[in-house]
Design a protein with these regions (language model features):
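Interdomain hinge/lid region at the active-site interface
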Residues: 49-119
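Long, positively charged, glycine-interspersed low-complexity recognition regions
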Residues: 124-130
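Internal alpha-helical scaffold of NAD(P)-dependent oxidoreductase catalytic cores
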Residues: 1-66
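A short hydrophobic/aromatic micro-motif that marks alpha-helical segments and, especially, helix-coil
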Residues: 35, 97-98, 122-124
Length: 130
């Protein structure tokens, strides 16, 4: 009955076991929340003047840190419960951040552009696989 309800609301349903769910959700949900929380932390640590943040932050920053406004009392236990998968996702994310940092440090505009262009494919993935 729940499946019928979700389908009637035009929700996309993907069936998988709990372990698969936890692994995938660490990448597509939990990592997004952690990134948002920590981007907010980084800016708040660096920019001590809240007015400067307000004056300079645009819509891109606002949309990126939107998830950082989520409830810590909800998310801390989720992060703890899915710790193993989240650590794996964070390790992969940190590796990618370091690689991109290296491209910036070495002025490798060609590889930087190539990397960003490849990643632009995510917009089509999020529109839905037909």
């Amino acid at each position: 009955i729940a499946k019928e309800l979700f389908l009637s609301m035009e929700m996309h349903i993907k069936e998988m076991n709990a372990d698969e769910h936890d692994k995938h959700i660490a990448y597509v949900s939990h990592l997004s929340h952690i990134t948002s929380f920590m981007l907010g932390r980084t800016v708040m640590d660096k920019e001590k003047n809240e007015e400067t943040i307000y004056d300079l932050a645009g819509s891109g920053f606002e949309s990126t840190v939107r998830l950082g406004k989520s409830s810590p009392s909800m998310w801390a236990p989720i992060f703890q419960q899915n710790k193993k998968n989240i650590i794996e996702a964070l390790d992969e994310y940190i590796k990618n951040i370091k690689n991109f940092k290296d491209l910036i440090e070495t002025d490798n505009l060609l590889e930087m552009s190539k990397e960003m262009k490849e990643i632009n494919a995510i917009k089509n993935i999020l529109k839905g696989i037909k």
